[in-house]
Amino acid sequence: MIYLVVLPFATAPLFRLAERLLDASISPSLQNAIYYYTLLAVTLIIFHSFLGHTTRNFADNLGNACKSILVGLIALYGLNELVYRLTRMLVNNHTNLNDTTISAQIHDAPRVTLLIVIFLAPFVEEVLFRGLVFGNLKSKSRTVAYVVSCLLFALLHVWQFAVVRQDITYFLLMVQYLVPGLVLAWAYDHTGTLWSSILLHAAANALHVSAGM
């Protein structure tokens, strides 16, 4: 919940405070880099044992993991096309501000943004949403694990924009992120290693970015 709700709004005041203390300006691209490198470091420290275990599972099931990543990519893009058409029917007057924000950041600072989008964000998000949320709920109910992890993942990508724009209908765009959340959870569940969902997430982001460039 800290990553989902608190950090998006807490980081801006913290960087303003840092600028005053340092008497220097911190560019948005540098802020993003600091933010995600900090998240990466915290994630590695907290989940190092789990990451070691899932890395061994990946090495032991490399063939199955690679096949699952390929199947996941095909499913992701096939289902996404259907969902995209559905959301265009439901919210034709809404632009996906998450995508436009990333596009603007790539234009302003391509190297830093691509590093974040393709490497840092997939790693952090998969550890939290699939490793932590899905992994903990799966032992209680696989269905609940899929539903909750998918909804939280979708909520992450739209709620800030809905709040800033004060438009509750913007939450309808969560539908666009349910398919990725479902496929990524399946990749982890099917292979037993989080690296399947991390690499699938990274590959999907890389293809999405390259298609928009």
Question: Model-derived features: where do they sit?
Answer:
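Transmembrane helix-loop-helix hairpins at the membrane interface
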Residues: 81, 110-213
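Alpha-helical transmembrane segments
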Residues: 1-13, 39, 70-76, 146-152
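Juxtamembrane "helix-exit" motif on the non-cytosolic side of transmembrane helices
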Residues: 13-23, 87, 158-164
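Residue-level signature of transmembrane alpha-helical entry/exit and packing/kink sites
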Residues: 1-4, 28-36, 64-69, 109-114, ...
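Alpha-helical transmembrane segments in multi-pass membrane proteins
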Residues: 2-50, 97-108, 112
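Structural signal for the C-terminal ends of transmembrane alpha-helices
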Residues: 45-55, 187-190
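Membrane interface segments of multi-pass transport proteins and intramembrane proteases
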Residues: 18-29, 88-93, 137-147
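Juxtamembrane helix-loop-helix connectors linking adjacent transmembrane helices
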Residues: 23-27, 52-121
